């Protein structure tokens, strides 16, 4: 589940590199999972929901792991193949796990390294010093801890008995 902040909820045409709209989908992903206009919040949300369900299922089939909140975030961030590679090969260098995916093989080593290091928290960069040292296990643990922390904060903020 993805929770949007109030600031994000109104940035329908937001772009981050090649990712567009409310749920930051690429044009390819939107064409595959949705229809209509990528910047239309309803169309973007429907495509994202279909993408999240489909990729969580593929991840579970591949890894035999139930997609937790943190795994779902990892799937959204790294793609289902990237997330599956990270989870199933925790001792491998993380960028090499990305290069083991279809997209990684297509885009190459430089892209794989960027996909990891640009999504690594500063504190973890300080500990590991280099993308060439960061393991998939450490990368997964970093996001698990971050998502679990945010989920706990959100859960505490929602009144008991609420439907949120």
PLM-predicted stretches and their roles:
Residues 1-115:
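Catalytic glycan-binding domains that act on GlcNAc-containing polysaccharides
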Residues 117-164:
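Low-complexity, Gly/Ser/Thr/Pro-rich intrinsically disordered linker/tail segments
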């Amino acid at each position: 589940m993805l929770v949007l902040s109030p600031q994000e909820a109104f940035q329908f045409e937001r772009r981050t590199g090649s990712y567009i709209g409310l749920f930051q989908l690429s044009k390819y992903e939107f064409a595959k999972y949705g229809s209509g206009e990528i910047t239309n919040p309803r169309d973007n949300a429907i495509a994202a929901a279909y993408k999240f369900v489909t990729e969580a299922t593929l991840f579970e089939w591949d890894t035999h792991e139930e997609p937790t909140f943190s795994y779902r975030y990892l799937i959204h961030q790294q793609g289902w193949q990237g997330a599956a590679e990270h989870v199933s090969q925790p001792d491998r260098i993380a960028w090499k796990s990305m290069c083991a995916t279809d997209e990684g093989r297509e885009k190459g080593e430089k892209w794989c390294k960027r996909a990891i290091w640009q999504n690594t928290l500063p504190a973890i960069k300080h500990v590991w010093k280099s993308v060439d040292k960061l393991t998939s296990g450490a990368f997964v643990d970093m996001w698990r801890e971050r998502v679990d922390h945010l989920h706990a904060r959100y859960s505490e903020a929602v009144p008991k008995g609420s439907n949120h």
